[in-house]
Amino acid sequence: MIEAIEQGYRYFGCGGALGFDTLAAQTVLRLREIYPEIRLILVLPCRDQTRGWKQADVAEYDRIMKAADKVTYTSEQYYSGCMHKRNRHLVDNSSLCICYLTEQSGGTAYTVNYARSQGLKIINIAE
């Protein structure tokens, strides 16, 4: 992310999911202390995304939401396609995709392939 910041990227969109999304958001928030010009934009699939999560994960999600510069919901309620809608929104409003892709199928692979098809630069930190 530091390389992206040094290249002039200022807005970092994140989907708010458990795992890499959480780590990415935490990293942006830490880096914002050093680079106060960067912004964290959470693009969330629905308002009840945390339903069924562990209490500690919900607490961290809430902390990240409060610290984010902007929070956008792509749907009010969960439905079977809301995660894809969120992912497409992230790609459609980005010029760079920082990901952790280890599998060639699934939601992350779909999103990275879509980003590639839209001409985004891809940085896969798993490589």
Each model region followed by its residue ranges:
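Acidic/glycine-enriched connector segments
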Residues: 1-127
